[in-house]
Amino acid sequence: VELGSTRIKGVVIDESFAPVESGDFEWESTYDHGIWTYDLADAREGLCQVLSQLKDREGLAAAGISGMMHGYLAFDKDWNLLVPFRTWQNTITADAAEQLTQLFQFNVPQRWSIAHLYQAILNGEAHVSQIAHITTLSSYVHYMLTGENVVGVGEASGMFPIDSATGNWNEEMLKKFETLTQDQPWNIRDVLPRVLLAGQDAGRLTASGSAWVKGLLPEGLPFAPPE
């Protein structure tokens, strides 16, 4: 299932990767108080609408969630959304992106999650002290389905720089970012999701995850890392 910018799309493929059936749901971002955003309730409803269009859901062998990269979804320790979803469409992090690019000596675009996080810090936004998790749209949906707070390495590369040798967050850049957040009650290492490579175990659909999609998928369904 792909949560794209204009449509949520679901495609079932067979063992030879040929498409068998599909479903879709149209949605669009809204401009609210200077922020391009989507309502996460719409993401859930759209996902359910897509799944309801697929006939052989019980016969699925595995599933995966994809979505628009980048952006900023910040949650507290109980996974309550702290501020509306800030999508990749926003260009509101110029100061943070420039400063991080200089600090890391590595290009950090405005749309990256870490640029959004640091801009919120620079802005003195009240929610920053409550942050326990930041993630992307596909990883949020994956967490709601499986209870696993993970991100695929491709998706991760739009959150924070990746070390291609380890397939994980860049250690030297994590250390540099820590120097900027010493006054925060959290550490960036704890706030970011766990990075997985393609093919690694990313969890299975839980009972609560199945309920989250109105029972449209069977409990125990294995999931690929979200990308």
Predicted regions and their residues:
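Residue-level structural signal for beta-strand termini and adjacent loop
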Residues: 13, 25-26, 87
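Glycine-rich phosphate-binding/catalytic subdomain of phosphoryl-transfer
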Residues: 52-227
